[in-house]
Amino acid sequence: MKDLINNSIKHHSEALQLIDESVIINSASIVLDAIKKGKTIFWCGNGGSASQANHLSAELIGGMYQKKINPFKSICLNVDSAFITAWSNDDSFNNIFLRQLEALGA
């Protein structure tokens, strides 16, 4: 068990070294700029990433500040299970988020 944990830590540490921090900084700047301009942030994900997207969207709406500031415009596209299952059945799973963005005028 100890070897498994140590190997996991080693692999995660190696993966962290490969991250280009400029990509993270650029992404954060894009999100912050959109928030400052009053634009809506759209989130989406698949599987566990869908849960992450939902959480991030909820935080922007107000969870992280508990009403100390105005909420930010934030929509998580993967929470509409009725649409996702209907559209992927009737059309294609490949463009479920695109279709929602078209409907929302984004």
Language model: regions and residue ranges:
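Generic N-terminal amphipathic, Lys/Arg-enriched alpha-helix
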Residues: 1-19
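Hydrophobic packing residues in well-ordered alpha-helices of helical domains and bundles
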Residues: 5, 24-27, 53
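Generic structural microfeature
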Residues: 7, 26, 90-92
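A short, well-structured juxtamembrane/interface segment
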Residues: 19-37
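Glycine-rich, small/polar surface segments that engage phosphate groups of diverse ligands
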Residues: 33-105
